[in-house]
A protein has these predicted regions:
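Catalytic cores of the polymerase beta-like nucleotidyltransferase superfamily
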Residues: 1-262
């Protein structure tokens, strides 16, 4: 599994078990409005995984080629959060539908402190301790430093936008990298995630060492998914966790705390 991403395997509606009747009506509203405005709209991450497992998702995340500012213009009930990782939150009473723009591939660089509010690639929503409202009027949407890693490979800043073919490589586990397409109700699978979900197997997208260096908290997340969903951790992933568990000492305490509460 190496970049660039291959064309996705498109699984038609009659070959998977996800139904619109299982999806939050508010998530459907977001998806259809994006589609009607000419944008792509996909459910992505943990919600697709859970629906395939016959579980009720705790939230629904959307990925799109619309920029955060474009999402905000489509929804009066939308707020942009995070300067270092920009997300759109669309509010429907107590329910929040999170909308993220497709991300591009990593570009190593030196930078500042690691992100505490890392991206929603994990399939469980972003790790945001104190969401920061984003002022779209003064922000640079795609500066040359829009994706920055530190000397250890940890993600520092992540606003490099791309396509769905790029976005899949930014996600953590294959089980969290399935995209439900509202246009034809198909599932797009780039990395064998559908088979892994059905087999309850946890595999990392790409090289486990690289992905754990980018975000050491992924190691805790792997253990949580294995316990919560009764998944078996792939042997190379398990070996990398044993080898690089010391990297957790460099993770922001707030993110470690948040992960232990899930």
């Amino acid at each position: 599994m190496e970049s660039p991403a291959p064309l996705a395997r498109v699984v038609p509606r009659d070959q998977h078990t996800v139904s619109r009747s299982q999806i939050s009506p508010n998530a459907l509203r977001v998806l259809y409005r994006l589609k009607d405005a000419g944008f792509q709209g996909f459910l992505v991450g943990g919600c697709v995984r859970d629906l395939l497992l016959g579980l009720r998702p705790k939230d629904f995340d959307v990925a799109t080629n619309a920029l955060p500012e474009e999402v905000k213009r489509l929804f009066r009930n939308c707020r942009l959060i995070g300067r270092r990782f920009r997300l759109a939150h669309v509010f429907f009473g107590a329910e929040i539908i999170e909308v993220a723009t497709f991300r591009a591939a990593s570009a190593p660089a030196l930078g500042e402190e690691p992100l505490a509010d890392l991206d929603p690639e994990e399939g469980e929503g972003p790790e945001i301790s104190e969401p920061e409202e984003f002022d779209a009027d003064i922000a640079d949407t795609e500066g040359e430093d829009s994706h920055v890693l530190d000397m250890h490979g940890r993600i520092l800043r992540d606003n490099a936008y791309g396509t769905i073919d790029d976005d899949v490589w930014r996600r953590d586990f294959t089980a969290n990298a399935l995209y439900y397409n509202i246009a034809d109700f198909s599932i797009w699978d780039y990395v064998g995630g559908l088979e892994d979900v059905l087999a309850r197997r946890l595999r990392v997208i790409g090289d486990p060492e690289t992905r754990f260096r980018e975000d050491p908290v992924r190691m805790l997340r792997a253990a949580r998914f294995a316990a919560k969903l009764d998944f078996t951790i792939d042997p190379p992933v398990e070996a990398a966790i044993h080898a690089f568990s010391g990297l957790l000492a460099s993770a922001p305490p707030a993110r470690l705390f948040d992960e232990t509460l899930k």
